[in-house]
């Protein structure tokens, strides 16, 4: 979308055209799952080989394969300087349950994969879909119990949910513990509960 001669430095052009393009595809894995992304790439190649596709073509192919709505993703990723930054804002206990409040600090919305590790060594996964995607991603960790929470509306800066367990039973809470989301400040993605 931005012509190469509009960049002041070649290195900036390289980052915007190559690195950001690579991250676009890796974020698709985070958004729609690995299997859907691989199917998308195969179908995209089959449909557009020897042609001149546009950015909308990869987005439309991913939408057809997965069923997710991805207009917002293409717009945020290619036409803005919005960043992805989520954090754990607060962890509190009430009535033998633990309330967890997450916050969207950056302007780019994303669905959230969150893992709670308990003091007994077990782990539980929570998935917070993004409302404007109209989609629920396949479970990337089928060996772990997964709870799908209500959708997070993109305009809401915070999201709070409860776990029906005491805070004393929780060891660590992590947003995207595998590091697949392009969060610019991953150090605020985990919360360790010290005794």
Language-model regions, residue ranges each:
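Short acidic/polar inter-strand loop motif in beta-rich domains
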Residues: 177-187
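Beta-strand-rich binding/interaction modules
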Residues: 71, 84-159, 164-176
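Long, contiguous hydrophobic alpha-helical segments, chiefly transmembrane helices and signal peptides
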Residues: 62, 114, 181-183
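Exposed regions on extracellular, virion, or secretory-pathway luminal proteins
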Residues: 79, 166-168, 184
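Terminal edge beta-strands and adjacent linker/stalk segments
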Residues: 186-194
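Amphipathic alpha-helical substructures
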Residues: 5-7, 11-100
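Extracellular acidic, Ser/Thr/Pro-rich low-complexity tracts
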Residues: 64-66, 104-106, 183
